[in-house]
């Protein structure tokens, strides 16, 4: 089960995201929510998350700044990140891509687009796990030889 942190300054969006899909059926568990990027970073100090779904425009620290901070952090750089935005402006998407955002979904969030993005992340995680298994397998073989 991949752990998800939702980040949005609108409580009704957070509620809606929790109810939009069957998270467990898709292999995800919502472990928390935050109202802005700063709150998200505080959450991550005491909790683990594999994926963050974040709004772009929020007070205190926006989603792009959160993404930037995660990518320069040794501890958090590998967290998957999906932007949820009401802005179709290419500039925001370009900035998100620059910092290795895994997907960019326009609001209002459509169920199918969210499921598609989550499945893409789950696929990336499966590839990552398979590579780790192969690496461990090779190391075990090396020690036996």
Which residues fall in each region the model found?
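Active-site residues of response regulator receiver
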Residues: 8, 55
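Two-component/phosphorelay signaling modules centered on CheY-like receiver
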Residues: 11-32, 46
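Helix N-cap/capping motif at the beta->alpha junctions
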Residues: 33-42, 63-65
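Receiver (REC) domain active-site loop signature in two-component systems and cognate sites
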Residues: 58
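Interdomain helical linkers/hinges and coiled-coil/dimerization scaffolds
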Residues: 97, 103, 109-145
């Amino acid at each position: 089960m991949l752990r998800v942190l939702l980040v949005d300054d609108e409580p009704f969006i957070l509620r809606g995201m929790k109810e939009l899909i069957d998270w467990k059926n898709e292999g995800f568990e919502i472990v928390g929510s935050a109202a802005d990027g700063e709150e998200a970073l505080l959450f991550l100090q005491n909790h683990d998350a594999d994926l963050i779904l974040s709004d772009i425009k929020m007070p205190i620290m926006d989603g792009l700044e959160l993404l930037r901070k995660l990518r320069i952090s040794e501890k958090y750089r590998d967290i998957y990140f999906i932007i949820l935005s009401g802005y179709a402006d290419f500039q925001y998407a370009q900035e998100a891509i620059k910092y290795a955002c895994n997907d960019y979904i326009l609001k209002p969030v459509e169920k199918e687009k969210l499921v598609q993005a989550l499945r893409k992340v789950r696929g990336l995680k499966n590839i990552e796990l398979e590579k780790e298994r192969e690496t461990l397998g090779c190391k075990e073989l090396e020690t036996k030889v």
